[in-house]
């Protein structure tokens, strides 16, 4: 009888997360799990089952100007993923993702059902980039010890909008006026150039999990 595979992180992985503010865990979800999640998300995307976030509603650079415009019904996110079916809930509670997050936090886990309870659906033509930001701008918790878990359902690289992060930026104290009214980093600010110069792309394969501190850019 085979022993169960541990989902725990090594001390080196914990140290790297604490230093860089993010950590890639390869092959955390099986091909079958990724296929089931992608199929369920695709069906709901095709049917435009709410709640949804549309590119046109956000108005980021390059987005359709309205829902009536060409590409105006392009969906950016399937929101409320936890309530969209058992396949999503099963993954949310999977030890492959819960155990390392619990280990990094050193505290009981709580799953937030607000902003990041979602499937990102980046469209090749109408999908838009998001400016540099920290995820904790979306939340109002007293303590900032929050971790986002991102599961790649397919390959993510420079050709299709892979995430970019700034290693160590979760520990950076910003200067006054370095964020705009929506808490996006003002890249023209004198103190931002050196920060953005450290940015790196996070390439992922289907099944890889990216964990990152909510204070990371």
Which role does the model predict for each range below?
Residues 30-31, 119-121, 137, 156, ...:
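Short, solvent-exposed loop/turn segments at secondary-structure junctions
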Residues 95-99, 147, 205:
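A structural signal for well-ordered alpha-helical segments within the folded catalytic domains
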Residues 107-110, 136, 141-144, 151-162, ...:
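Active-site region of the double-stranded beta-helix
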Residues 134-146, 197-198, 204:
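A short beta-loop-beta micro-motif enriched in histidine and acidic residues
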Residues 117, 149-151:
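A structural signal for short, well-ordered beta-strand segments
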Residues 2, 156-217:
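Double-stranded beta-helix
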Residues 1-20, 26-132, 138-139:
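Non-heme Fe(II)-dependent double-stranded beta-helix
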Residues 127, 144-146, 209:
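Coil-to-beta-strand transition motifs
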């Amino acid at each position: 009888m085979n022993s169960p595979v541990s989902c725990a992180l090594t001390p080196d992985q914990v140290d790297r997360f604490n230093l860089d503010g993010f950590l890639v865990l390869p092959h955390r979800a099986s091909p079958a799990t990724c296929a089931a999640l992608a199929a369920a998300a695709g069906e709901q995307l095709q049917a435009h089952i709410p709640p949804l976030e549309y590119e046109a509603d956000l108005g980021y650079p390059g987005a359709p100007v309205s829902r009536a415009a060409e590409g105006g019904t392009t969906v950016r996110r399937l929101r409320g993923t936890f309530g969209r079916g058992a396949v999503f809930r099963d993954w949310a509670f999977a030890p492959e993702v819960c155990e390392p997050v619990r280990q990094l936090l050193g505290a009981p886990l709580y799953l937030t059902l607000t902003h990041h309870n979602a499937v990102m659906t980046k469209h090749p033509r109408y999908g838009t980039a998001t400016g540099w930001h920290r995820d904790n701008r979306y939340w109002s918790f007293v303590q900032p010890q929050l971790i986002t878990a991102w599961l790649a359902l397919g390959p993510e690289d420079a050709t299709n909008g892979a995430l970019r992060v700034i290693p160590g930026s979760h520990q950076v104290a910003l200067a006054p006026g370095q964020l705009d009214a929506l808490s996006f980093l003002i890249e023209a600010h004198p103190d931002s150039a050196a920060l953005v110069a450290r940015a790196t792309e996070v390439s992922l394969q289907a099944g890889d999990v990216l964990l990152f501190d909510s204070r990371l850019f």
